[in-house]
Amino acid sequence: MAINISKQISSMKSVIITSFMNDPNIVSVIDNANVEDPQDLEYENIFPTWRIDTAELEKRTVISVKISTTSSKKSDVVQRFFVDVLIFTSQELQKVPRTSVARGCTRIDYLAQRVEDILNRSTEIGLGEAHLITNEEDSIDSRHPARMMRFEVLGFSSNYVYL
């Protein structure tokens, strides 16, 4: 039976999103007073889809995840996956309180540090280690600073067959 790449992507996203929601520092810096259980941050502040909807998310901090892959050759057993993480917030929320775990950092820079700590060199989401390949400061628009990060992960190709 061949590996289903879409199923592999869904599984990777689930592991990544869960690790973000289980990180008390990420939960603290996202600072959503409407959420009591960190698992409720999914689809509120942490999205397993690419999400840039600044009208709805005007005063919110968001982490969204996208996973893509390149086509593999018929002979490839291992396939490269790219995990893209977009972190953005409104300009008004960039500064974090001095008492926060993120003191001395902007909100998106601190969240990027935590994401990198969780994903870079992680062996939880693929075969071998995930590797950070880009980490770029950007903005969604004039009111929403952002950080884009890309990790490379190896997984099984759809050509791989269990024996």
Labelled PLM ranges:
Residues 1, 5, 99-100, 136:
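Residue-level detector of alpha-helix boundaries and kinks
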Residues 24-28, 104-159, 163:
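Acidic-leaning, charged glycine-interspersed low-complexity segments
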Residues 32, 89, 97, 127-128, ...:
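Short linear functional motifs in flexible/disordered or boundary regions
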Residues 65-97:
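Active-site-adjacent structural patch at catalytic or cofactor/ligand-binding sites
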Residues 94-107:
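Short histidine-centered catalytic/ligand-binding loop motif
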